[in-house]
Amino acid sequence: MKLSYLDQTGHLTPDKLEQTITKYAPLLEKMKGQQGLDPMGTGWMKIDRWAGEEELSRLEEIAREIRETSDAFVVIGVGGSNNAARSMVKALQKPGTPEIVWAGNTLSAPATSRMLASLSGKDFSVDCIAKNFETLEPGAAFRLLRRALRERYGDGYSKRVIATGTIGSPLETLCREQGYTFLPFPTDIGGRYTALSSVGLLPAAVAGLDIRRVVEGAKKAREAVYSLPPRENPALQYAAMRNLLYGEGYRVEMLASFEPALQWFSKWWVQLFAESEGKEGKGLFPAAAGYSEELHAVGQFVQEGSPILFETFLSVEETDTPLPLTPDGVEDGFGYLDGKDFGALNDAAFQATRTAHSARLPVLTLEIPRLEEESFGEMFTFFQYACVLSSGMLGVNPFDQPGVEAYKGWMFKALGKNAT
């Protein structure tokens, strides 16, 4: 990934950035050696451990069976259990593959009823993804979907159930008792870091993606992190820019893109940084915007509102989708577009927005060559390493999320469960 920036505010200057990179360069070496990091959160750094040949072959075989027997594949999960998979599937799903249905990510009865109704008349399989099988949304949805499967397929329904959980968890016990297929949820990886494991890769494989190419992209990004020196290391540079701007008083980072296919990746990114850094009264608030549409919504605030945010653009260099605008004989006032490609319009809007916004706030740009499987593997891995570095600069643990337990205690009490 290429990283660049524009800034006319004076908050992000070459000298300030150089000082910040120099200050935190030792963090890069510590991270590569996993020094000071919770070993129960670093499993994703060993890509082959959870995405090696044996694991990939098994996932490909299971995905093949699902494609042959199912019109729809229901992924039950919330947060880290579905965000990575959904970002890949929404952007790159291949024609002729099963519909991927997302469940267990809401407690809305109307939304859940619509999800169940959408499966009517379809052959379907499910994958319940839950690290400890205590989260309410997937647990409740799994109960409803088990009933739907049993009503449709009788006692043989268990052949259509996959459960992804930790070894020794209640979910594994349930699989053993009911005859479901069990896939391991990595014990040494938190949910938001599980893209390169069965959690993220099985739904992607069912959707027709080449998951080996996803892994190749991840390895490419990892190699860059481990081989490039601090001043050429994009992950350290990006983390340093974020830390520098946080120190300059900025409190919001907005990830923006002119490619709608990246909107679900943005949700993954938001969770990654919100849960990893938002603790001990610290951290940038991660927000996301989909341009050009939202230039007609939040663009006004970005240009002239409270100076609390900076922007990070995620840019796709090549779209490989020619769409020429040819005259149609109607005088519509848009003759200046004659002969231009639709992609050129999008690029012009991006360049203009970046220039205009940089007069008001710092603007970072991360470029990927094209939107494909390798790109997702590279983006997941790049941002995960950058997040660990950025969290280290803040002095917080990037692998826990103690704050989410507060609302759960009240919720479980209201529902009659003994919360600890």
Regions found by a protein language model. Name each.
Residues 1-64, 328-336:
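Extended, charge-enriched "interface" segments that sit outside catalytic cores
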Residues 50-67, 232-244:
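A short, well-structured juxtamembrane/interface segment
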Residues 64-228, 409:
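Glycine-rich phosphate-binding loops that contact phosphosugars or nucleotide phosphates
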Residues 81-84, 109-111, 134-137, 169-172, ...:
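Flexible loop/turn segments at secondary-structure boundaries
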Residues 88-99, 148-151, 272-283, 356-360:
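Short helix-loop-beta junction
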Residues 152-311, 400-420:
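Active-site phosphate/pyrophosphate-binding segments
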Residues 287-371:
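Helicase-primase coupling helices
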Residues 370-420:
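C-terminal helical/tail subdomains of lipid-metabolizing enzymes
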